A protein has these predicted regions:
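Conserved catalytic core of nucleotide-sugar-dependent glycosyltransferases
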Residues: 145-238
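C-terminal catalytic/acceptor-binding lobe
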Residues: 2-53, 61-75, 222-343
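Short aromatic-enriched loop/helix-cap "lid" or pocket-rim segments at secondary-structure transitions
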Residues: 98-101, 150-151, 175-180, 281-283, ...
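Active-site-proximal specificity loops/subdomain of glycosyltransferases
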Residues: 90-133
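Short glycine/serine/threonine-enriched helix-capping/active-site loop
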Residues: 89, 164-169, 271, 278
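Short loop->beta transition adjacent to catalytic acidic/histidine clusters or analogous donor-positioning motifs
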Residues: 50-54, 76-89, 104-105, 134
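A conserved acidic beta->alpha catalytic loop
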Residues: 59-64, 78-82, 89-99, 143
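Short beta-strand-to-loop acidic/aromatic patch adjacent to the donor-nucleotide binding site
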Residues: 133-144
């Protein structure tokens, strides 16, 4: 184990400048003339009787964004009122308090590492959810449906298909609930082998039968930014991510010395549902591409790979090894800060 003095602390101002430069990337978002002009109205969900599907939400908020927490409270309240079974995996930094009081459906972890923990927390949660739920729905904690019966629609579709991307159209909302952007799912149009980020969205929500989810060998190490959705899409549909010159799929294959495989034995589908993404800052500030480039440069200069920098705890949570924790924490905390989710 290295002492703290042996870790070379990178200049945080340089890292910030790198990220701010990369933020000007091409988001590949076309001008859309047919975006609906109405404002989204939140609707209560239908109370559920058949509860065979567990909804998984994750929450980590290292910079204490009010809007991210407010969005989670909105989603949680709707699920509570409809008695929809859900599980929240909450992660807090070691010096911070948890937001939620202990509950059977809230799994809580603490860490002293800054990572993009979404996929890792999903992986941790699935291991803890009772086996009585034979279906799961992975859902971002800022997603709403306009159909009160969405839970039943998804669950019934999972009776026919093992994998479901549970929407036809995804809408990005402004802070006033007007619609900023509109995209399709990635599973209905398979004529291309590339994810068309201008028209398609690989994220927000996926649903699975429980046994098939485990059979997919879910990759939970996309710890730099939200690349897990692209990796999952490739495993399901064989659609490649070419959002950047250096695909994030190739990035993680290289960094973790693995090869993602398409699971062609399971049928997949979508649902005739609309989903709506609650606002938390400008889309340009997400920096999904920029942070990968910054970290790639760091790794190249040191001739090291992520697989050598990460360790897994007994409870399945990933953390930086002590030797690299200082450097990576500086980079990742700067990334989370520069996202400006409360703007």
């Amino acid at each position: 184990m290295f002492s703290r003095q042996t870790i070379r602390k990178p200049d945080s101002s340089i890292i910030k400048d790198q990220i701010k430069t990369k933020i000007k990337m091409n988001l590949n978002i076309p001008i859309q003339d047919k975006i609906p002009k109405y404002k989204f109205n939140i609707r209560q969900y239908a109370t559920q009787v058949n509860k065979d599907m567990a909804v998984i939400l994750v929450y980590f908020n290292f910079v204490k964004s009010n809007r991210i927490l407010q969005n989670l409270y909105t989603v949680k309240s709707l699920l509570d009122n409809a008695q929809i079974p859900y599980f929240i995996t909450e992660l807090a930094f070691s010096s911070d308090e948890f937001v939620f009081n202990p509950q059977p459906n809230i799994f809580q972890f603490k860490t002293d590492s800054y990572m993009f923990y979404k996929e890792n927390l999903i992986f941790c949660a699935e291991k803890l959810i009772p086996e009585s739920y034979d279906k799961i729905c992975l859902m971002d904690a800022d997603i709403l449906f306009d159909n009160p019966e969405w839970y039943t629609v998804i669950s019934q579709q999972l009776n026919e298909y093992n994998i479901v991307q549970p929407f036809k159209k995804a809408h990005w909302l402004q802070f006033d609930f007007s619609i900023q952007m509109l995209k399709e799912n990635v599973v209905d149009e398979l004529s291309s082998d590339v994810i068309n980020y201008g028209l398609e969205h690989p994220g927000f929500a996926w649903a699975f039968t429980r046994n098939v989810f485990n059979d997919l060998d879910f990759f939970d190490k996309s710890i730099i930014s939200s690349a897990g959705d692209a990796i999952l899409t490739f495993k399901i549909t064989s659609k490649m991510d070419r959002h950047t010159n250096d695909s994030v799929i190739k990035f993680y294959e290289t960094q973790f010395k693995t090869k993602f495989k398409v699971n062609s034995t399971h049928e997949f589908s979508s649902c005739d549902l609309n989903i709506y993404h609650l606002y938390h800052g400008s889309l340009g500030n997400r920096q999904y591409v920029s942070i990968h480039d910054v970290v790639s440069n760091y790794l190249s200069r040191r001739n090291i790979k992520l697989i050598d920098m990460v360790e897994r705890r007994e409870d399945n949570l990933l953390e930086w090894k002590p030797k690299f924790k200082n450097d990576m924490n500086i980079m990742m905390l700067n990334y989370f800060t520069l996202r400006k989710d409360d703007e």
